Amino acid sequence: MSMNSFGHLFRVTTWGESHGTALGATVDGCPPGVAIDAGKIQHWLDKRKPGQNKYTTQRREADEVKILSGTFEGVTTGTPVQLMIENTDQRSKDYGDIKDKFRPGHADITYFQKYGVRDYRGGGRSSARETAARVAAGGLAREAIKSIAPGIDIKGYMTRMGAHEIDRSRFDWDQIDANPFWTPDAQAADEWASYLDGLRKSGSSVGAVIEVVARGVPAGLGAPIYAKLDTDLAAAMMSINAVKGVEIGEGMSAAMLTGELNADEISMGRDGPQYSSNHAGGILGGISTGQDIVVRFAVKPTSSILTTRKTITKSGEDTEIITKGRHDPCVGIRAVPVGEAMMACVLLDHLLLHRGQVGQNQGHIG
């Protein structure tokens, strides 16, 4: 299996399976001299790890990261950084009944069609467990960003669960870390709790929309035409398990606007150009404008549900299946820190590309 890496200069290769001994990431291209220790990465992994509340899978994983290489005396050396997370709470026996059946909505059937072999234990490589490695790499990327562009801040949050959307008039940044859904709307969090309780007890699931915002990003990141910043951000978010759609800025809604409404007007401010709005999501022509970078992605409902579903076996026979085991009723909850991590990795990658291409030279306005 190839294609387990992403990035240009800051390049991340993830490895491992859901029920294997361990999983992790090999990060190549991290600049030397970045102050790092396991605790700084652990902070972000703790946001993603399972079993923290009744709304996520009850699989209990500590997700403790170990840094195996690439650092010396608390700083990166410029050599590959190897990050490892051990799996400690696998229950592979839960999947014994489905080893010859394909789970509807999962990658079981496509992996088998492509490779002729399939790890049925929790989805193997296709499991969202793989995203723990991305979050670890993202933690490293955040520390590197601090040393290159210390004003950048990345924050993700849930804006929709199923048909229930937040009220943006109640948007409160301080609420995001105060509820189990990472949402800026406290009232929506209460409503979602009741809604998800019912779904969880019935054995069903629901999708979500996650928004990730990067503030303080300098103008000039990205390049035309095949190295656009939004191209790489879209690919990064789309690569996350269960993601079925990605938007930058106004996204699909831009198709419903007129040119007068969609184009962000520009005026000269005290510190440079300023914009009247941000329909572009902070990117024009594939290059950052200096405004907030706004990315949004849709996560489908978890396909592992306690409802009898029609499927087929490896031998081509029609059958039925119930997916037992421990699963997230809304996988979008734990996708929030994953989206943040992917944003961090892409931004660091483009900071390094920009520095390598133009150095400190940029067009000055005013």
UniProtKB/Swiss-Prot annotation:
Reduced FMN (FMNH(2)). One of its GO terms (biological process) is amino acid biosynthetic process. Its cofactor is FMNH2. Keywords: Amino-acid biosynthesis, Aromatic amino acid biosynthesis, FAD, Flavoprotein, FMN, Lyase, NADP. NADP(+) binds at R48. Pfam families: Chorismate_synt. This is Chorismate synthase. The lineage of its organism: Bacteria, Pseudomonadati, Pseudomonadota, Alphaproteobacteria, Rhodobacterales. The gene is aroC.
